[in-house]
Regions:
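Conserved acidic residues
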Residues: 25-27, 52, 135
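Short beta-strand-to-turn element immediately C-terminal to the catalytic PLP-Schiff-base lysine
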Residues: 90-94, 114, 198
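Beta-strand->loop->alpha-helix junctions that form or flank phosphate-binding loops
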Residues: 77-84, 103-104, 182-185
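AMP-binding/adenylate-forming catalytic core of the ANL superfamily
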Residues: 134-208
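Structural motif
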Residues: 27-29, 55, 196
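AMP-binding/adenylate-forming core of the ANL superfamily
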Residues: 110-132, 136-138, 144, 194
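AMP-binding/adenylate-forming
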Residues: 1-37
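Gly/Ser/Thr-rich phosphate-binding loop
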Residues: 41-97
């Protein structure tokens, strides 16, 4: 803000950071929960839509939240970063013609995959050594990446590695009750995939 000559608008940290604002800032950084909360209040939603540059970080963006942001008139970005990188090191556009599933690293950032297909980051301006993450990723020909899940969320069932996040994403549109995917020991397959649901499953979901 100081480098760009911007005016800072201090707000009290909360789940509704826009509630006391009367005009939209040019730039804002929020977490997914704050964006979701703001969308539920008409006055806050109106301000949210007027933000010229909105970056969202600190956690994954749900597909429904992503869909709610696609028609925003100004630029909305998802950021990728962690404590070790001090700030975000890549951006992914969520709306407009440049919307993408892939993160584009900043020019000074180099990326590669480890032998376990986890993302490895080299940010020489921040750290001398490479940072090996637990995020299982895919890198395309344009040196962009997307996150498939966490290494510690992989189930090896019968020699087939299944990423929990991908299974949950596939099931989410079919299940209206809260649920999660986990695993259980199995004599034949070593591990089997288990669905834990809160409440009654729909009748058309086969239970075995």
């Amino acid at each position: 803000a100081l480098v760009a000559g911007l005016d800072l608008l201090p707000v009290t940290p909360s789940g509704h950071p826009l509630k006391d604002l009367t005009k939209a800032p040019v730039f804002a950084a929020m977490i997914p929960m704050q964006v979701y909360n703001s969308l539920q209040v008409p006055e806050e939603k109106a301000i949210l839509q007027q933000i010229r540059h909105l970056i969202i970080g600190g956690g994954p963006i749900d597909s429904q939240l992503n869909a709610a942001l696609k028609d925003f008139p100004h630029a909305v970005w998802s950021t990728y970063g962690m404590t070790e990188t001090l700030s975000h090191i890549a951006l992914r556009r969520l709306n407009g013609p440049e919307a993408s599933d892939w993160y584009t690293p900043f020019e000074s950032i180099q990326i590669r995959l480890s032998k376990e297909n986890t993302l490895v980051i080299y940010a020489p301006e921040i750290c001398e050594k490479e940072l090996v993450t637990n995020d299982i990723a895919e890198i395309n020909g344009q040196n962009q990446f997307r996150i498939l899940g966490r290494k510690d969320n992989t189930i090896n069932t019968g020699g087939v590695k299944v990423q929990i996040e991908q299974v949950e994403a596939a099931l989410k549109e079919h299940l209206s009750v809260p649920f999660l995917i986990t695993s259980a020991p199995d004599e034949k397959f070593g591990e089997i995939i288990v669905l834990l649901a809160e409440g009654q499953l729909p009748d058309d979901i086969e239970q075995t």
